[in-house]
Every structure is written in C-alpha cells, then in structure tokens.
Amino acid sequence: MANEQHVELIKQGSEAWNQWREQNPGESIDLSEADLRGLALAKANLKGADLKKAKLQFSNLAGASMEGANLEAARLQEANLQGAQLENAVVKNCNFMEANLQNTNFQNADIQGSQFNEDVLFGQTNLKGANLLDASGLSVMQIQTSLVDKDTKLPEYLSDDMEDEDFLNSMI
C-alpha cells in the first residue's frame, strides 16, 4: 500500500513533488495502489518509485522521469506519457489503451503482458531492448514508427511479420 505522505505530496503537482524529492533524495517512494487518476505530473521525478497497481488513468506524465520504476499492473488508460523516461522500468501487465507514448523511452523495459490498442499513439517510441512478449493489441504500424533493435522482444503474433530481414533492417 502507498505511503499516504507520498500520495498527499504528489497530489500537489510536479513542482512541489520535485522540490520534495530534491530535499529527500534517499527516500524510497511508495505510491503502490494509489489513486492518481487525472493528475498533472508532467516532468515529475518518479525515478525508482513503486507505482505497482497505481491508478494513473488520464494523468499527464509527459516528460516524467520514471527510470527503474515499478509500474507493474498500473492502469495507464488515456495517460499522456509523451517523452517520459521509463528506461529499465517494470511495466508488466499494464493497460496502455489509448495512451500517448510518442517519444517515450522504454529502453530495456519489461513490458510483458501489457495491453495496447490501435488508439495508442506511437512515434519515435524507444523500444530498444524492451521485452514485449505476451503484450496484446500492438500493430505492425505502431512498431514501424518506433525505435527497435535486435534485442527488442516482440509478441509472437508480430514476430512472423518482423522476421522479414529487409523489414528488420529497415527498423534498425
């Protein structure tokens, strides 16, 4: 369960939150299972935070720093994650339906089992080294507009389309 002090602080917005983080750099952040729906958290420092099962629907997380964070089973429907940094983050079993993931950095992130749909916005989304096994709802078009490499693990239903060597070379 979330630390109530952390929940109250983050509800004050990114500026207050980031100022508190600067003053408390060693604090372990627990926002697990917190209801953070619709919050304006653009550029929030959530590095290494525990956001497991957090409700983040409709939240603005554009440009947020979430490197190494645990967002397992978080609800991110219609969230704005444009330009967010999720490098090495755990985002397994998340719901990304209708989210904005343009320019989001998922490099080396664990995205297994997450749910997407055709309304998820991709574009220059960094999926290099990301594990997308068992993710559902992704399209070839979404992957084509993203950055992938030989270490990107795609769901099996996309793997057949991606096996074409010319296609893969055009992606790398």
What are these regions (language model features)?
Residues 5-8, 15-16, 20-172:
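Tandem repeat scaffolds
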